[in-house]
Amino acid sequence: MEYTLEKGSWENISDAVQVEEETLPNSCYLRDNSAYFLNDTVGDLTMVRAGDEPVGIGKLSVLPDGSGWLETLRVRPAWQGRGVGKAIYARWLEEAQSLECPAIRMFTGTGNVRSRGLAERFGLSLAGTYIGATANLLTQEYCVPQGFEPVRDFRFARVLLESGRWEMEDFVVMNNTFFRCGEDTWRYLWEQGMVFADEQYNFAVIGARMLRQRGLHVAMYGGDGVRCLKFAKAYTQQQGLPAVTVSYPPQNSRIRAELEREGFVHDASCRIVMERILERKG
């Protein structure tokens, strides 16, 4: 079957939304996130058509370190297993190389054998396993611990972030986006105003890459963990937002215990991040 690939735009975004809402009716976000994808990111939203019919979509987004993040892969149920996903991956790889991305990455659930197999077919391999835990903030009011302020000095922010790097096993996660730890990611988090600390050097990195209205994400925290999580819950609630999520390596028993103490509910299963390092042309 031959497919036509076209770039997503405001002219055809309704077709892309239709694909997602048929594919994942309970996990849609493209309708709410179209402006961010089309206006605020480098990288194309690709749509696949069979004749005039939209059958699949996928987004490549360039992250702060220049890597290509492969997201929003959706193939309508009747078209799965018919090469639509392969066509999107081939386009992603071509685009990432043209953008000189040093790597490409994606995430999927640990039980999604088809998704992992497709990624492996295009040279991606396992880079990490993470689990999420979420606190619903609609049931009670939280008080903000005193002393947490945005970190104004990037050098200080970098020291804090590097101190938590090993515990996060070299990725920080927001909105199911896995950012490789390093200078470019640290600067992005700091420039976005996401790094907070108190005078005792307890710190939390909290914000959202996108879809802020659905809640915030703690990418990393350090020091007095319970104090940091109390700050994260109260700060999120102050913004009028309904939930805050933390993602971390599941074998970290200390983080798990702190989250459970503070009322976070863990996801039923883990997610994996897969990665391929790309060779530079020339």
Describe each PLM feature range:
Residues 75, 81-95, 117, 224-236:
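Conserved acetyl-CoA-binding loop-helix of GNAT-fold acetyltransferases
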Residues 86, 110-128, 251-267:
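Conserved active-site alpha-helix within GNAT-family acetyltransferase domains
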Residues 105-107, 125-140, 265-277:
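Conserved catalytic-core motifs of GNAT/GCN5-like acyltransferases
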Residues 122-212:
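Amide-forming acyltransferase catalytic core, primarily the GNAT-like/NAT-type
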Residues 62-70, 80, 205-219, 266-270:
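A conserved beta-turn-beta hairpin within the catalytic core of GNAT-like acetyltransferases
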Residues 20-59, 165-197:
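Active-site rim helix/loop that mediates acceptor-substrate recognition in acyltransferases
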Residues 95-111, 239-249:
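Conserved GNAT acetyl-CoA-binding A-motif
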Residues 47, 53-61, 69, 74, ...:
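Conserved beta-strand in the GNAT
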